[in-house]
Design a protein with these regions (language model features):
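Extended, charge-enriched "interface" segments that sit outside catalytic cores
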Residues: 1-114
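Glycine-rich phosphate/cofactor-binding loops in nucleotide/flavin-utilizing enzymes
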Residues: 2-37, 43, 50, 72, ...
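Internal helix-loop-helix
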Residues: 78-172, 212-214, 337, 402, ...
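A short core secondary-structure module
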Residues: 202, 206-241
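Flexible, small-/acidic-enriched active-site or ligand-binding loops
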Residues: 240-264
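A glycine-rich, basic-preceded beta-loop-alpha segment at the flavin cofactor/substrate interface
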Residues: 259-287, 304-321, 428, 451-475
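C-terminal helix-coil-helix/basic helical segment that borders enzyme active sites and/or dimer interfaces
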Residues: 338-367, 382-383, 460-480, 486, ...
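C-terminal amphipathic alpha-helical interaction region
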Residues: 437-542
Length: 542
């Protein structure tokens, strides 16, 4: 009998974008590749390609989805009633975290201190964040604890650094931090956890912490009130750390974040009594850098998803990527993402040494701005995919839920902006170094020149206003404008970097839209004359 072929048009799949994976996320990111070379990290290109291919693999996508679906479970007691405080984690979480540790993202600059060490790590951090943002929290804290210990507790650093920076996932150690309490949030002065001397250099901590991310960490830096005031302590996970519950969070659901009670926990002092904030701030500055890098990563991944979809999807008889309105949106996303990437790598390079004033100031400025821009960009990118981007099989819902976190972690928007204002007054060398970096592009674009002039005037007014009143007398007015002051500084650095290093089409579009006042408030309102085709082709080469 002859076989009759039956065609079922209902089941035929047409006009759908093919899977993005497998993809080498580093190979298709020209902005990151160029920035890595420029910032001294050319020696790490092979590592970045390997990480980019692994993060862009079908396996990474599978493990990320599984880790998000099978959320951590806290077991406070065993079957007999003994306190155990263990967190059950899906094997896919371990696959993702192991991938970050074995690539050295948690400590490579400390293992290999050389020029470009931090840019190489930043590139690897950006790429592996594409696999899963949740695992990057313990990775970031472990990286950040080392400089804090080296500076304020060198004897502890000597004991723990080999494990904190080692590449063996099973034998290594992870670090966390616990500052926030339920009554205080970002206001560490409100901390009520007590630290009482217990002899021979030990203290006992009693109190609670409202947020403690990643309870399986081996060690933690904890803030508590000692006899001489707020102090920083080194705590090894063990008896007395009683985890109460895991947070039911909007995003990073693969990451275990907890509430913990401290009941006679043994701890060692880091730094001096009463100097807790200066001791822990070195850790905070490095995790703030990772907030910046992580947000740049989310922006890039969302932009790639939008570009890939638009390149393969047609509507009204024409590919989306060829339609003028969509092309405007995609080009706008691309320039915003590239600006975030180049800023993240430039700031990361300052951590290699020799630029302490620029490093501290630029970290605060760019952490505020890039983390603030990420959620809106991701939302716009999701819209490019339409309904396909709104379903959980897409990568977009996960990126969207995770996007707001970095703007909250290590100080929300107002905290970050006010930190910049304080730095302008207390550490003016930081502002000077920051503006000097921006002015390396002076004379190259009239819009940037005008913007820099305004930024100089605005920041000068923070110190002494036109009416001659002092900083304290003008405190309300200055704080009221805090976000705009910091925004102008951030845009100045991004524009300067693009004018100096990006193709003319990218730099011109950015300066026109972000500095020249020629664009609207929504993405996709770039002015006429922008070379969108060139920008899009650069953002995701065919």
């Amino acid at each position: 009998m002859a076989t009759i072929a039956v065609t079922d048009s209902v089941r035929e799949v047409r006009n759908q974008a093919p899977p993005l994976q497998p993809i080498d996320l580093f190979a298709v990111d020209l902005a990151l590749r160029e920035a890595l070379e420029r910032e001294g990290g050319g020696w790490g290109v092979a590592r970045a390609h390997e990480a980019g291919a692994a993060a862009g693999s079908a396996a990474a996508l599978h493990h990320s989805r599984r880790a998000e679906r099978n959320e951590p479970i806290l077991h406070t007691h065993d079957r007999y009633g003994n306190r155990i405080d263990e967190v059950e984690l899906d094997p896919s979480w371990h696959w993702l975290l192991r991938g970050a540790i074995e690539r050295g993202i948690h400590g490579s600059p400390w293992r290999e201190p050389r020029d470009g060490a931090h840019p190489v790590r930043a590139a690897l951090f950006m790429l592996w964040s594409n696999a899963n943002a949740g695992v990057m929290c313990p990775v970031s804290m472990t990286y950040a604890v080392v400089p804090a210990l080296r500076h304020s507790a060198p004897e502890i650093a000597a004991d723990w650094e080999p494990r904190l920076t080692g590449l063996d996932y099973g034998a290594g150690a992870l670090a966390g931090m616990a500052m926030t309490e339920r009554q205080g949030g970002s206001d560490v002065r409100a901390i009520i956890t007590r630290a009482e001397p217990a002899g021979e250099g030990w203290y006992e901590l009693n109190g609670h912490k409202w947020f403690c991310s990643y309870p399986p960490c081996d060690v933690f830096l904890v803030l508590a009130q000692a006899p001489a005031g707020l102090s920083c302590f080194f705590v090894e996970r063990g008896p007395g750390m009683e985890f109460q519950r895991l947070k039911d969070k909007l995003g990073t659901r693969s990451l275990a974040s907890s509430e913990v009670e401290l009941r006679g926990v043994r701890a060692r002092l880091v730094g001096e009594e009463g100097r807790g904030v200066p001791a822990i701030i070195r850790m905070v500055n490095h995790t703030r850098l990772d907030c910046l890098i992580g947000s740049a990563s989310a922006m890039r991944r969302a932009t790639v998803e939008a570009l890939h979809h638009a390149r393969h999807r047609s509507a009204f008889g024409e590919p989306l990527i060829e339609q003028p309105a969509m092309r405007n949106v995609l080009a706008d996303l691309a320039i915003e993402s590239e600006a975030a990437t180049v800023a993240a790598l430039r700031v990361a390079h300052s951590y290699d040494g020799g630029e302490p004033a620029f490093q501290r100031f630029a970290t605060a400025v760019m952490k505020y701005w890039v983390c603030k821009r990420a959620p809106s960009l991701v939302g716009e990118a999701l819209e490019c995919l339409g309904g396909n981007g709104f379903v959980e099989e897409s990568a977009m819902p996960l990126i969207y839920r995770d996007a707001p976190l970095n703007s909250i972690w290590e100080g929300s928007g107002n905290v970050a902006a006010l930190d910049v204002l304080r730095a302008i007054v207390s550490e003016p060398a930081g502002l000077t170094a920051f503006l000097a970096e921006c002015e390396l592009a002076a004379g190259s674009d009239t819009r940037l020149d005008a913007h820099l002039a305004r930024a100089r005037e605005t920041t000068a007014a923070v110190l002494v206003g036109e009416d001659g009143r002092t900083v304290q007398e003008r405190r309300y007015e200055t704080q009221f404008r805090a976000r705009r002051i910091v925004e102008d500084l951030a845009l100045a650095l991004q524009a300067s970097l693009l004018v100096r290093h990006a193709p003319g089409a990218v730099a011109d579009a950015f300066c026109s839209a972000r500095l020249g006042g020629d664009a609207g408030h929504a993405y996709g309102t770039l002015p006429a004359g922008v070379d969108a085709r060139t920008i899009i082709g650069r953002a995701l080469p065919v």
